[in-house]
Regions:
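Short, low-complexity disordered leader/linker segments with a strong preference
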Residues: 1-25, 324
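N-terminal secretory/targeting leader peptides
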Residues: 20-114, 122-124, 128-324
Length: 324
């Protein structure tokens, strides 16, 4: 019996050593700078996963487009590469169109409304479709980077002021149609090129959130901010379903739980971070304008009709108990 127990113990030790030796690495790519709010959130996630997994799951964060554009990273993830991308509903709409409504102008008024939408059975079904039909695993859809505003070199008080203005926006159909409906000429280019684009006058401005415009120093080349808050930027962390299923079940659950945990924590910190960024930009010379947003909201209504989102918007409002 003693010999059997000793042998069993040796076998158990061997399997334990093999299990401990199974280490996994995930690379997260983002277009934002290393000082951006969302990048620092993913660095927090990396540290926490390393600690909680006992070193079995290592996450490395690559800012400033080091892994390529969002679409390129997502395609790599779908093919099975151990990569994840920080992105938004505009990108996921290329696979499941309906998810894009979360990134339509003036769809939601704040983070809480966006979060409620992601918790509906309708949205959960879309996430399942991303996984089963397109090979995309949503690790978390509750990261938040705040409302987006126009950054330009002329005051924007009404949609008419946007006419003829070449404004950089996210290169997804929902964003392009929203910005066009408000009167601007939407231009798609990587975030890392925006500063030079405005400086060289290839762009007249951009639309983005404070926690990106400040670390990217957009206020140096765009002197006005119009606080339209047209997009509420919910951020998603996406990886490939193939890679996700290659993880042991305990690490799968740990990754999901921790990503959502950090997403919720950082969302709670966003308001203060956004206000600090705005204050710093104003101190550097930025002029902030707070226009009446009613004309902008009216202007984007045709975009909902054009994309077939009007009925879907009403359905989701009903699901989350939102009144117009």
């Amino acid at each position: 019996l003693a010999v059997f127990l000793a042998a069993a113990a040796m076998v158990g030790l061997t399997f334990g050593q093999l299990e401990a030796a199974d280490k996994y690495t995930l690379r997260i790519g983002t277009s934002q700078t290393d000082q951006a709010f969302i990048t620092r959130a993913y660095m927090t996630l990396a540290d926490r996963l390393m600690e909680k997994s006992g070193g079995r799951l290592e996450v490395k964060v690559f800012p400033a487009g080091q892994l390529g554009g969002d679409e390129d990273i997502l395609e790599q993830a779908i093919q099975g590469a151990p990569v994840a991308v920080n992105t938004d509903a505009g990108r996921t709409s290329a696979y499941v169109k309906e998810t894009g409504i979360l990134m339509m102008a003036y769809f939601a008024d704040n983070y809480d409304e966006c979060l409620k939408v992601t918790q509906t059975e309708t949205f959960k079904k879309w996430e399942q479709d991303l996984a089963t039909k397109h090979g995309i695993r949503v690790l978390a859809f509750n990261f938040y980077d705040g409302p987006r505003h126009f950054m330009t070199n002329k005051p924007i008080n009404t949609p008419a002021d946007l006419k003829g203005q070449r404004i950089r926006t996210i290169g997804s159909e929902v964003c392009v149609e929203s910005i066009a409906a408000m009167g601007a000429t939407p231009v798609s280019m990587s975030w890392g090129e925006v500063y030079n684009g405005i400086q060289s006058k290839a762009l007249d401005g951009c639309e983005a959130q404070n926690t990106s415009t400040y670390p990217s120093k957009i206020y140096e080349v765009a002197k006005y901010q119009s606080k339209t808050g047209h997009f509420q930027l919910m951020q998603a962390l996406l990886c490939g379903e193939v890679w996700f299923q290659s993880l042991p079940q305990d690490l799968q659950q740990l990754l999901l739980d921790t990503a959502r945990e950090v997403g919720a924590e950082t969302a709670a910190q966003l308001v203060a971070a956004s206000e600090e960024s705005e204050k710093a930009m104003v101190e550097a010379g930025l002029t902030v304008i707070e226009p009446d947003t009613t004309p902008f909201k009216e202007a984007v209504k045709p975009a909902y009709d054009k994309l077939g989102f009007t009925a879907l918007r009403e359905q989701l409002y009903k699901e989350i108990g939102k009144t117009k």
